Amino acid sequence: MGAAESINRVLNTFFNGFGIPGYLEDSIPPGAELPYLTYKPTIPGGWNEEASFHARLWYPSSAGRLPILQTEDKISAALAGGLTVPCEGGAIVLRKGTPWAQPMDNPPEGYLCEYLNFEITQLCE
């Protein structure tokens, strides 16, 4: 397994750790039910390099904003001070990007969506 695949596995585990399913943005299974999180990682080009990417929290609008904000808070708390996670050949540091969270202006009807911005640094051993 290469470094990029290892980083993708680490990110998948991270994004599935908040009580809702996490899917790669282009791999949402047919029939997936809300709520869920989608993400599209950008893997840094080399060791000690940084990249940014986003994830999206998707919730039914009928639930109001509280559940989406609670999940956002859980993810934010997990990243407090940066989260260092070992992976093949080193580790990644995952941090909140700037701006951290912002609602989607015109989500599809019946949906609420919040963008979350991340910074990722790939560190060598």
Give the location of each predicted region.
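Charged, amphipathic alpha-helical segments and their flanking helix caps
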Residues: 1-31, 38-125
